[in-house]
Amino acid sequence: TRFRERHDIMNSKMRTGRAMILLMIILFLSDNICAQDAYIHRLGMEGRAGYIFPTSSFLRGENDMRKIMRSACSAHLKYSFRLPPGTAADRIYGSSYQGIGLGYFDFGNRREMGTPVALYAFQGARIAGITPRLSLNYEWGFGASFGWKPYDYLSNPNNTIMGSKVNAYLSAGIHLNWILSPRFDLNIGATAVHFSKGNTRYPNTGLNTIDFKIG
């Protein structure tokens, strides 16, 4: 019996030792993988010029300016990170990147709409490689926009598209990514944008644009 107990204790210690060795190997490999796949951080600027879809009477001319609202413009500051090009993880995930952005918008009617600011998260990846330096990418974003001048029965009765000072921001688009150098690249493409409160507050016809972007 004592021999069996000693034998069991020795087996238990051996299993514990093997588990510790295996754990050390896993941690060592994880550290190496993390060191090899350290993230690349990027800071970018982007300008957009857009067309406003006339989905409401307010946008079609029933506003204080008595004119159709067709154009929008915005400026964006964006931070993103990704895995180094050429690594196994980068190839698996299609050169994906993610980050946060800050956008400033002007729709040509500051008195009735304001000049909202959007804070959003975004993610993108390569759709297809055209040349070693040129690729077709997609990008989408989701966040919140602040600083709208919403509908008010007395002070802002024409604005039937926004019923709140804070509204959701959604975007999706494609662009060409041209790698100019290891530190700089150029993006040119189109982005569809939607602002609304998601029918949680009325009126809420929302605002939709299609933008040309460069950055």
Predicted regions and their residues:
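Membrane-embedded beta-strand positions of outer-membrane beta-barrel proteins
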Residues: 43-47, 98-100, 138-142, 172-174, ...
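Repeated loop/turn-to-beta-strand initiation elements of outer-membrane beta-barrel proteins
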Residues: 86-88, 182-186
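Short glycine/proline- and aromatic-enriched beta-strand/turn motifs that initiate or cap beta-hairpins
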Residues: 36-82, 215
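Transmembrane beta-strands of outer-membrane beta-barrel pores
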Residues: 49-53, 81-83, 102-108, 142-150, ...
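Gram-negative (and chloroplast) outer-membrane scaffold detector with strong preference
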Residues: 86, 93-144
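Extracellular loop and loop/strand-boundary signature of outer-membrane beta-barrel proteins
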Residues: 61-65, 107-110, 156-162, 197-204
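Residue-level signature of outer-membrane beta-barrel architecture
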Residues: 81-83, 125-127, 176-178
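Residues that define the transmembrane beta-barrel architecture of outer-membrane proteins
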Residues: 39, 69-75, 113-119, 134, ...
